[in-house]
Amino acid sequence: MRIRSIQYLRAVAALLVVVAHALLHPLNYMDPTYARLGDYGVLLFFVISGFIMVFTTGRGTFPPRDFLYRRIERIVPLYWLVTIGVSILAVYAPFLLKNTRFTWGQLVQSLLFIPFYRENGDLVPLMKLGWSLNYEMFFYCLFAAMALLRATTRVLLLTCLFLLLTLIGALIDFQAAIPRFYTAHVVLTFCVGMGIALLYQRRSDLIRGPLMTALWAILGIMFTLLGFAQPHDVPITIWVEIPLTLASASFLLLGLNIERRLPNSRIGIALGDASYAMYLTHMYFVAAIIVVLHKLTGELLPLLVTLASIALSVLGALFVHRYIERPITRWLRRNLAPAKRSEPVAQPVSG
């Protein structure tokens, strides 16, 4: 079962990240408002991911092997291709990248979703946006480890585990990359999505009726404004992530509430399908636009760079999804899939 509102929200999340980088990349400084746009998109992806994992696996148990295979076949191939592409650029065209420097050790860690520090202190892989996929894979592995539990028990245990990790991270200032990364409070966003999925499975009154439609719309707007109203000297921390996560949850609940009244937009569905490709590949297109426009005009006009980057990123993602991502996924399902399969698990939502 495909939920249209989820597809549309996935498209919105990817576009938020694209717009943020299209605005940021030409600048020589970090604009906090633009950066928060990108973080908003990722937080929305994480909330959707938590929802999708619970929704697609149902109320009971599920085969963990099939679940993990489907997660790997959808996430790994394109991410590996993009990571290898970034590595090639770092070696042969480093001027296209701001802070990325290639080492074999970092390539291996990136491909295996192992967090590490870069030379500049950033806790991100070679393909910077892969940090979110490190969290996704961590979530998937823990979710699969509880496959033999019923959905409610699974969600409660995972929520307790993530709360414990967050508490440990708050009490201990880890310096090592792995414990510092996985005890960050951002992991709690998955719990928000999982909780909404439980409500949806039980046909909760929170997900029906005109009153709830108005409530979730108002809360979504209010929390969004609150997240962006934080002073610019406040970094992307819990004080920004809390309202933006609540805004993401509100818009997810709004979408589920009006699902039957939503138009069946082919463009919206297509962009939702291509959202993972858009998330992973858009920086290639943004960099290409900047290089081409700089050579053609001798200067970078911010508005032109932004609009051209967004347009090319969307078109490029649709192309990559149709002619690279989907064929690879089909081939893997035909040739390497486990003999016995569970119900299909939806596409990755964080990329």
What spans do the regions from the language model cover?
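Alpha-helical transmembrane segments in multi-pass integral membrane proteins
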Residues: 1-8, 12-36, 54-66, 116-122, ...
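Residues within membrane-spanning alpha-helices of integral membrane proteins
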Residues: 7, 11-14, 42-43, 49, ...
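Membrane-interface helix-loop-helix regions
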Residues: 40, 54, 75-137, 141, ...
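Alpha-helical scaffold elements that line and support the substrate/ligand-binding pocket
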Residues: 50, 140-147
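Phosphate-coordinating loops and pocket residues in cytosolic domains that bind phosphorylated ligands
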Residues: 69
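Active-site helix-to-loop segments that bind/position phosphate- or nucleotide-bearing substrates
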Residues: 72
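Long, low-complexity, intrinsically disordered cytosolic termini of multi-pass membrane proteins
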Residues: 349-351
